[in-house]
């Protein structure tokens, strides 16, 4: 494989260059740069992959710099996967229904949505909840998602799942990543990064 992990490239210099391409200058802060690099390495060891997840990497860097202010906060979510055709509870293409409870500022919103697979259902429910308050979300479209089971052999239901989401707006597209033993949680984490980064792009 010619593709290398971000952490295996030229270390700090590579990460600083990547951050610069995302509009973030890390050149004058060696300590923070090292902390971010260590975080990336740790996450990659747990299954994260940032080569096609610029959105998640940008959010991660902003967290370290104290520049990340979430636009919404999750209270809880619930996803029901239609298993009538014996597709398996983790089937990414099974008809699904999601309900989310979200806080935007001091508002609490409960919304439901339907979609193909847990990602589609969560995306529909989240948009239903927040678009009225964050209208830029209407310009974003979930264009692709990939689910990969990591360490599959012998892991059974505890196998780690990586979800990569591609989202687009009028100016381009970006990828985000979520990793968890629970496909729903991995999907949610990737989805939140995708919306948050899209809002950061819209504001920038």
Each language-model region and where it sits:
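Terminal or standalone catalytic/regulatory effector modules within metabolic enzymes
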Residues: 1-204
């Amino acid at each position: 494989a010619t593709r290398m992990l971000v952490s295996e490239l030229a270390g700090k210099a590579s990460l600083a260059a990547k951050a610069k391409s995302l509009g973030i200058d890390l050149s004058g802060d060696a300590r923070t740069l090292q902390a971010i690099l260590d975080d990336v390495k740790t996450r990659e060891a747990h299954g994260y992959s940032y080569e096609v997840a610029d959105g998640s990497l940008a959010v991660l860097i902003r967290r370290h710099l104290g520049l990340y202010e979430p636009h919404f906060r999750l209270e809880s979510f619930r996803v029901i996967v239609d298993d009538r055709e014996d597709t398996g509870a983790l089937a990414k293409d099974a008809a699904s229904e999601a309900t989310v409870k979200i806080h935007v500022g001091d508002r609490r919103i409960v919304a439901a949505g339907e979609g193909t697979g847990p990602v589609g259902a969560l995306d529909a429910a989240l948009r239903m909840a927040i678009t009225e308050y964050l209208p830029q979300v209407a310009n974003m479209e979930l264009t692709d998602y990939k689910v990969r089971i990591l360490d599959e052999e012998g892991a059974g239901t505890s196998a780690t799942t990586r979800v990569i989401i591609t989202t687009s707006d009028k100016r381009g597209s970006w990828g985000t990543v979520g990793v968890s033993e629970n496909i729903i949680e991995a999907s949610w984490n990737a989805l939140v990064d995708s919306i948050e980064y899209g809002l950061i792009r819209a504001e920038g």
